[in-house]
Design a protein with these regions (language model features):
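A conserved pocket-lining segment of Rossmann-fold NAD(P)-dependent short-chain dehydrogenase/reductase
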Residues: 172-192, 196, 200-216
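Flexible, glycine-rich beta-alpha linker
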Residues: 127-129, 154-169, 223
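A hydrophobic C-terminal alpha-helical subdomain
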Residues: 248-320
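Conserved glycine-rich Rossmann-like NAD(P)H-binding loop of the short-chain dehydrogenase/reductase
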Residues: 28-36
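N-terminal Rossmann NAD(P)H-binding glycine-rich loop of SDR-like oxidoreductase domains
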Residues: 3-26
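Substrate-binding strand-loop-helix patch
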Residues: 188-195, 217-235, 244-254, 290-293
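Conserved Rossmann-fold NAD(P)-dependent oxidoreductase catalytic core, especially the SDR/UDP-sugar
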Residues: 29, 78, 89-152, 157
């Protein structure tokens, strides 16, 4: 399958920027709809990237955007919602379930067979959190279209890299406060680098062997949340005291943070952590999957202004 033009939904976000760059580097024309074009200046100057101001909330708008495209990539997702509703809130339903429904229908109307979709490791209709339940239902909708469309789903663990809201958030707090209250420190993750995720998407685009597959995207090592916070503290040279919270106190803290205009954490995030975001030998990995170690990348953007970070960055660039 020869892919020359791609519609990238959610392309102005963290992972989308990496994928857009990879596509652009390969000479593929990329269309990234956005509501506020002025906020995406770094992408606008990329060659082969077009960013029309379009609201994608209607099937008709999606069909129009898909005209002349060879493939669609959907990365749209949210981490927080202001409502608590079973099985999930209106916000989660719209982003993770209703939008994939519209995308599938629009692909069929526009005659675009190739669809790649972002789910999440642990996504399932039976998962403990609204986020994972809605992601699971959205994934099922996309996978059910296989046959009429050529679909591939990706299910990453937590994604790290320059511009993330994961290690960078830890680093910001550790630099500012003398203590770090940490709940669910036992939760396990298998962090994967955003550039590796981008490569998985781009390498799969024209590969018929990936049609109908749901791939798990994980890094080479499993960490507890406490280990990741400790490592980030080491990178930034923080002496902050890390205080382990009981489950009750963790949910109280998350509830208070959830009330802020831009929450860093919510009770639903903690419920997601009840399921380890790891692959314990039951993975469906992409062919030739060789993920990059977190320790090779994190110092290049977390500790770049510390002596240790500068040395680690030099070693990484030098291939040492």
């Amino acid at each position: 399958m020869d892919i020359k033009k791609v519609l990238l939904l959610g392309g102005s976000g963290f992972v989308g920027t990496y994928i857009a760059n990879r596509l652009s580097q390969r000479g593929i024309e990329v269309t990234i709809p956005t509501r506020r074009r002025e906020r995406t200046k770094a992408l606008i100057i990329q060659p082969n990237v077009e960013m029309p101001e379009v609201n994608i909330n209607s099937e008709e708008a999606l069909v129009a955007l898909m005209q002349g495209k060879d493939a669609v990539i959907n990365l749209v997702g949210i981490l927080h919602s202001r409502d608590v509703v079973l099985p999930y809130s209106k916000d989660f339903a719209e982003a993770h379930v209703e939008l994939p429904k519209r995308i599938v229908a629009a692909c069929k109307k526009a005659g675009v067979r190739r669809l790649l979709h972002m789910s999440a490791l642990g996504a399932s209709p039976q998962a403990p959190s609204e986020y994972l339940r809605s992601k699971g239902d959205g994934e099922a909708i996309v996978m059910a279209a296989q046959g009429e469309l050529d679909v591939t789903v990706f299910r990453p663990s937590v994604i790290f890299g320059l511009g993330d809201s994961f290690l960078s958030m830890f680093a910001s707090v550790l630099r500012k406060l003398p203590f770090f209250p940490l709940g669910f420190g036992h939760a396990r993750f298998q962090p994967v680098w955003a550039a590796d995720v981008a490569d998985a998407y781009v390498d799969s685009l024209g590969n018929a062997a990936t049609f109908g597959q749901a791939y798990d995207l994980v890094g080479p090592r499993i960490y507890t949340l406490r280990e990741l916070v400790d490592y980030t503290a080491e990178l930034v040279g923080s002496k902050a005291r890390i205080i382990a919270l009981s489950e009750g106190w963790a949910y109280l803290q998350a509830g208070l943070m959830w009330l802020s205009p831009k929450p860093l954490m919510s009770p639903d995030n903690l419920r997601s952590m009840e399921v380890d975001s790891v692959c314990d030998g039951k993975c469906n990995l992409p062919a030739n999957w060789h993920p990059t170690a977190l320790e090779a990348i994190a110092p290049t953007y977390i500790a770049h202004n510390t002596p240790k970070g500068k040395l680690d960055s030099f070693r990484f660039r030098a291939g040492r």
